[in-house]
Amino acid sequence: MIAKMMEALDGERFDIIMEKTLKGMTRVMIWGCLPYFLYVLIRMFTN
């Protein structure tokens, strides 16, 4: 069982899944924080 887990973690498939996960998390972070960042900028310059 441990050998199968290590094979899955060391294989090409893991790299593909990790790359897709990191791309998705980056998109969520950028598009999730961008509206808040714009809100802060607008509030900073209007006061």
From Swiss-Prot:
Membrane topology: Single-pass membrane protein
Domain of life: Bacteria
Compartmental location: Cell membrane
Location, primary (coarse class): membrane
GO cellular component terms, A-Z: plasma membrane
Keywords, in A-Z order: Cell membrane, Membrane, Transmembrane, Transmembrane helix
Transmembrane parts of this sequence: 28-45
UniProt-recorded name of the protein: Uncharacterized membrane protein YoyF
Species for this entry: Bacillus subtilis (strain 168)
Gene this protein is translated from: yoyF
